[in-house]
Amino acid sequence: MSKLTTGSFSIEDLESVQITINNIVGAAKEAAEEKAKELVNAGPTLFAGLESYRDDWNFKLLDRYEPVITPMCDQCCYCTYGPCDLSGNKRGACGIDMLGHNGREFFLRVITGTACHAAHGRHLLDHLIETFGEDLPLNLGQSNVLTPNITISTGLSPKTLGEVKPAMEYVEEQLTQLLATVHAGQESAEIDYDSKALFSGSLDHVGMEISDIVQVTAYDFPRADPEAPLIEIGMGTIDKSKPFLCVIGHNVAGVTYMMDYMEDHDLTDKMEIAGLCCTAIDLTRYKEADRRPPYAKVIGSMSKELKVIRSGMPDVIVVDEQCVRGDIVPEAQKLMIPVIASNPKIMYGLPNRTDADVDETIEELRSGKIPGCVMLDYDKLGEICIRLTMEMAPIRDASGITAIPTDEEFTNWVMKCADCGACMIACPEELDIPEAMGFAKEGDYSYLDILHDQCIGCRRCEQVCKKEIPILNIIEKAAQKQISEEKGLMRAGRGQVSDAEIRAEGLNLVMGTTPGIIAIIGCPNYPEGTKDVYYIAEEFLKRNFIVVTTGCGAMDIGMFKDEDGKTLYERFPGGFECGGLANIGSCVSNAHITGAAEKVAAIFAQRTLEGNLAEIGDYVLNRVGACGLAWGAFSQKASSIGTGCNILGIPAVLGPHSSKYRRALIAKNYEEDKWKVYDARNGQEMAIPPAPEFLLTTAETWQEAIPMMAKACIRPSDNNMGRSIKLTHWMELHKKYLGSKPEDWWKFVRNEADLPLATREALLKELEKEHGWEIDWKRKKVISGPKIKFDVSAQPTNLKRLCKEA
């Protein structure tokens, strides 16, 4: 085909000519930008760029919540000038210092996570438009506010798949700009890297929102459904007598074709399909909008991947993208398990059979001629995976292949342990494997059994063992009874929080009478096993907090039962309500959690969403009690999700490993000048309590995290009843888990009505004796003492431009 050159041509004299114009690059976004400019009440940051939030909002956050850096090392190895020693306030050859370099390191993690979700969204959007067409209406349930994150960043409110495209192009364009700042000789100021990280976090929630709204719409996922079906979860739920197809990753597009093939060929009760990570959550949402009886199952999080493979249960493994182990092919190959890569982001060096014949490909995989293949044609993928699973099952059953040792092999391996401690040093969780091996030598396997839940399945211990003991296999052998009983229930991801739920809870959240929203999200890098998140969720649910979950956290909460044999999903309702446990969905569903906070501002307070992030973030920071928990955070995506919460004024608590992200955002509660805002009624300064006192921090134990999170739900706008309720929970939890009353509780008291009702008199005495407050004991009222005054009609804001005098 000849190359078109610049110029013009005429078709005046041609006959029967048809000209088809498909996509004009950038045209959709340009048209959307022009349309957004026509909005009457839009905020100041339509299609926000790198600098848009910097001065008006980000720097205000960073002034109060100062970055606390935790470098992993003192060197910079970015370019060929290096490596440069940045210790002792030295600068590198390019001029950057440790602060700037560390800011860049954290920022790089955030944009990596943002890119991951954005690419996920792009893949789904393109595939679903190709399959269902651009005109498919977005259907997320009974809501009018469908896309709060898209709207807050761009001003757009898409109603169809096609109308989502400009928002996708916007995220991709800004990601390119952000990535460019990482290059040597670009940004060097730590505070500006933090500002850019916050901006990237906001983009991450747009990318996640795109991913979930298009799949909820096209795949008939539950739509804001508080009674979505309960799904079986755990390794013990797999029927070993049936062929088993195991899917791993986060992008469910290809898996839907496998499920369609199973249903078309009446195989849903003749084989097992189950998953790990968020693909597992989303495959159990597929076609569940009408609450049909589910047949797909969830095994668990990334920490279970190697454990499941070593068990020998899967007959075929299919991977897509994100949080997939890098050693799946060699591990599966040892056990005759074919591996099929269904997404170009993970191809493992496998031969590409996308254009090959289905029968020939199945024969290559069945015979072991190739260990696996790349298959990007989803129609073929669905057929190959199901047929291959049915064919591999009898072959593998006949061979009896498993990595789990026999009783004799188990004893021999245990006796080989030299108690050198190398495994414990290598273990990310510092598990006392030598101690467990010592007890096993004496016939007590309970210590190894306990390690099963605490072990994250990384096999670092095996690689340093001088005796070449397959330590993971030993642990799994000892835990066989526990594994067989690992049967829980998880509510299928329900999707967005509906407008009706926001109207019902908005007032309670802003006034403080609903104590807060606790969002349990993130990965499985827990310091002491998965049950930590169960304990945390149960504590807050019993205290009438709204608990929302996604991803690995949602799975792990469903793994455990009470003395009556019920999981938390069975014990508590699935709505966005006081004492409700709402599984929102997979990782990309996290956008609906920030979306819920944004919808409180939009629906309850009638604040403009369009291009108005700073005002919405200001509203949430001052009025909506919410705190995130990523107790096992390990990935770059976790850092971008958390940072996206931070820019909206939502604090997050991370587990002890998360200091490796290199940065926290912590305020100094004793710097009184940092705890002043404007009263929007008149522009006058007003003092507020130090709440929340961090945006991003870590805790050492789950017992420390619980009171920390309860405190982080206190907000300046709480009314007396709300403040009293929140102080009650915080002080009780502090006493329960840390053994004492918090030292700074009095800083949050504005008058006697703020005090917990049951202990009001005792606390008034303490205020008088310890802090010099004047108390009218006849009326039991505070006469003087508080530095913070209570005014029920005050309108706290950090933004001077929102004041009436402005």
Curated annotation (Swiss-Prot):
InterPro entries linked: 4Fe4S_Fe-S-bd, 4Fe4S_Fe_S_CS, CdhA, HCP/CODH, Prismane-like_a/b-sand, Prismane-like_sf
Per the UniProt entry, the Enzyme Commission number(s) are 1.2.7.4
Q: Which Gene3D superfamilies match?
A: 3.30.70.20, 3.40.50.2030, Carbon monoxide dehydrogenase alpha subunit. Chain M, domain 1 (1.10.8.190)
Where [4Fe-4S] cluster 1 is bound, by residue?
73, 77
The EC category is oxidoreductase
Residues annotated as binding [4Fe-4S] cluster 4 are 427, 455, 458, 461
- Which keywords, in A-to-Z order, does the entry hold? 4Fe-4S, Iron, Iron-sulfur, Metal-binding, Methanogenesis, Nickel, Oxidoreductase, Repeat
Pathway info: One-carbon metabolism; methanogenesis from acetate
Quaternary structure (record): Heterotetramer of two alpha and two epsilon subunits. The ACDS complex is made up of alpha, epsilon, beta, gamma and delta subunits with a probable stoichiometry of (alpha(2)epsilon(2))(4)-beta(8)-(gamma(1)delta(1))(8).
- Purpose: Part of the ACDS complex that catalyzes the reversible cleavage of acetyl-CoA, allowing growth on acetate as sole source of carbon and energy. The alpha-epsilon subcomponent functions as a carbon monoxide dehydrogenase.
Q: What is this protein called?
A: Acetyl-CoA decarbonylase/synthase complex subunit alpha 1
Tell me which species this is from. Answer: Methanosarcina barkeri (strain Fusaro / DSM 804)
